[in-house]
Amino acid sequence: MYMDQRLWPYRTPGIPDDLFIRDESIPITKEEVRVIALSKARLREGYMVIDVGSGTGSISIEAAIQVGSTGRVYAIDRDADAIALLRENVRRFSITNIEIVHGDAMDILPSMPEVDAVFVGGAGGRMYDMVRVACTRLRSKGRIVVDTIMVESMSSALNAMYDLGLEDVDVTQVIVAKGRRISSGTMLIARNPVLIISAEKP
């Protein structure tokens, strides 16, 4: 058994944010953005996945559910506090097919196995190089998915993808507004736009 289904007894992605243990100093890929990012990766049972800049672990955990007991997720983060929080969330969901790796992804990626999908949620200002190195771990027809709030990071990711000759390059801007109950009814509170850049290795 690769997860305890009592907390989230569904295969559908989109675990509510409040089910994760949170820390305001550590980023989380929000529920609606996460669903779109996961769809861009086109995961299947048994796939191998790398999550760079895993943060809270929301993408890693959702991906682990999608790839099932025969798949595996490698969650990489260089921040010790993020790694500790990730471990808490992995325990909370009783996920057994995630391998947590503490360190700089630029140093770690070259020794990682080939995978079917890579998520990049943090590059530390080195997005161009991160995408290039991450793609060395992708199998043919493997997919890379980058999410960022910075237009500069989007530009760097796109440049790397085009320079590498990746196919099916796609940019999606996600703008989410959530309802909040007030005394006279319900108002919508907008969240920051997020850019999702995805592509496929030939």
Set out the residue ranges of the language-model regions.
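Glycine-rich helix-loop-beta junction characteristic of Rossmann-like nucleotide cofactor-binding loops
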Residues: 39-44, 65-66, 136
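Conserved S-adenosyl-L-methionine
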Residues: 53
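S-adenosyl-L-methionine
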Residues: 76-114
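Short SAM/SAH-binding signature in class I
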Residues: 114-122
